[in-house]
Amino acid sequence: MSRRGAAEEKTAKSDPIYRNRLVNMLVNRILKHGKKSLAYQIIYRAVKKIQQKTETNPLSVLRQAIRGVTPDITVKARRVGGSTHQVPIEIGSTQGKALAIRWLLAASRKRPGRNMAFKLSSELVDAAKGSGDAIRKKEETHRMAEANRAFAHFR
């Protein structure tokens, strides 16, 4: 066990244009090979496309999509007496948002389409409406947790 104190939880910074923490979290997850300016370009293009598609505030669409994909509960593999059980555990809001962003980006990358901005905007609009691969992933996780409710006492 570590003798050092627990690390302070860092507050997420907000992005320069929209002053939104979710946008910055999205940028940091989409980042590849340290190319942050390219990540910002992709996000801002996706936000513009959302604005064109829905004709509403794109940040509210983003918030709605992330809220829709954020899981309340997940499963964790736990080894008990030689067999591995999927134990359902509740997750906090920060970890839930991080998972939601990861699932949204994975679903966007899988989508067929021209470029990442187009694919991301389509996935975000679908998630805000309650459909799409990311929503399906959340429902699948919740189903797994529900199926393994009997192992909840192994926590």
UniProtKB/Swiss-Prot annotation:
Entry keyword Chloroplast: yes
InterPro entries per record: Ribosomal_uS7, Ribosomal_uS7_bac/org-type, Ribosomal_uS7_CS, Ribosomal_uS7_dom, Ribosomal_uS7_dom_sf
Single Gene Ontology MF annotation: rRNA binding
Function: One of the primary rRNA binding proteins, it binds directly to 16S rRNA where it nucleates assembly of the head domain of the 30S subunit.
A cellular component annotation (GO) from this entry: chloroplast
Assigned keywords, A-Z: Chloroplast, Plastid, Ribonucleoprotein, Ribosomal protein, RNA-binding, rRNA-binding
Gene that encodes it: rps7-A
Species in which this protein is naturally found: Coffea arabica
PROSITE patterns, alphabetized: RIBOSOMAL_S7 (PS00052)
Annotated compartments: Plastid, Chloroplast
Family affiliation: Belongs to the universal ribosomal protein uS7 family.
GO biological process, one term: translation
Protein name (database record): Small ribosomal subunit protein uS7cz/uS7cy
Subunit structure, interactors included: Part of the 30S ribosomal subunit.
